[in-house]
């Protein structure tokens, strides 16, 4: 990242994000500099407002993205494809982007192949990073996920063993008397 292109505050945030330990969430990496609101954008609209950045982790460092021969706008967004060799089927890869117009936002990624993801940029050159979340994680709320799989049966088994043991003990005591 060519830090000389950005304000001191943005330089400090970029350094903080790039110096975050592996596995740190986007929310924790921002720390005190976390924006009040981060929105998720698709090709042309806000998909979700005020998403939860604690569901995301970094897949790449923060880097410059420069548009030379084209100027992205909200009416004419530019599709950019990225290579992400560590992408798996269990994760959703999106882009953390510092929009010159809106500030920090997340651009929805579209999986192109096993190691490529694309996103639409609606503003000019700035900084961005590939981020990911587990596919089961919700980005907009703290809703409880529906239960998947079988319920745990150990409480029933423990209860059954207790009652069978109690029955055997009662039967033994009644025969002795």
Predicted regions: what is each one?
Residues 160-177:
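C-terminal membrane-anchoring or membrane-association module
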Residues 101-109:
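Surface-exposed loop/edge segments in extracytoplasmic proteins
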Residues 99-102, 134-136:
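Solvent-exposed strand-loop boundary residues in beta-sheet-rich modules
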Residues 63-71:
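Beta-strand-rich interaction surfaces with strong enrichment in secreted/lumenal proteins
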Residues 118-140:
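C-terminal beta-strand-rich structural cap/linker in extracellular carbohydrate-active enzymes
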Residues 94-96:
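Beta-strand signatures of extracellular beta-sandwich domains
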Residues 79-83, 116-123:
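Exposed aromatic-hydrophobic patches
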Residues 1-58, 70-92, 132-154, 174:
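Feature for mature exported/ectodomain regions
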């Amino acid at each position: 990242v060519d830090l000389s292109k950005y304000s001191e505050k943005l330089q400090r945030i970029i350094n903080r994000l790039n110096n975050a330990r592996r596995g740190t969430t986007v929310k924790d990496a921002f720390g005190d500099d976390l924006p009040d609101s981060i929105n998720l954008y698709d090709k042309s609209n806000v998909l979700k407002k005020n998403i939860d950045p604690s569901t995301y982790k970094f897949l790449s460092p923060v880097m410059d993205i420069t548009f030379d021969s084209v100027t992205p706008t909200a009416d004419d967004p530019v599709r950019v494809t990225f290579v992400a060799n560590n992408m798996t089927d269990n994760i959703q890869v999106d882009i953390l982007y510092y929009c010159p117009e809106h500030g920090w936002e997340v651009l929805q990624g579209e999986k192109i192949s096993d190691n490529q993801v694309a996103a639409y940029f609606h503003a000019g050159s700035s900084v961005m990073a590939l981020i990911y979340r587990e596919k089961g994680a919700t980005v907009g709320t703290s809703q409880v996920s529906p239960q998947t799989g079988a319920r745990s049966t150990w409480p029933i088994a423990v209860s059954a063993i207790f009652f069978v043991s109690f029955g055997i003990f009662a039967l033994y005591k009644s025969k002795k008397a």
